[in-house]
């Protein structure tokens, strides 16, 4: 399993997501994970730009999968099935390693 991520927090990568009601929310790309070898797709972890920490000092992180387009651009973000334990375990393992660095 391999993963790529950017530790340079000065140069943030941002993405805008639009919900079902058309509301736009700006997110920072926290981490991208190369899961093509194991699962045939990549993953991205996002945190809202204006996220506030809860009483435990935590912020909500959202995870999505995506398959790169043939031209190398990112494809459409897809939710990760809740019952996909192997995918969630891999994401959690990579995220925990990222947070320890």
From Swiss-Prot:
Family membership noted in the UniProt record: Belongs to the UPF0473 family.
Protein name per the record: UPF0473 protein SPD_0182
Coiled coil ranges: none
Highest taxon, organism lineage: Bacteria
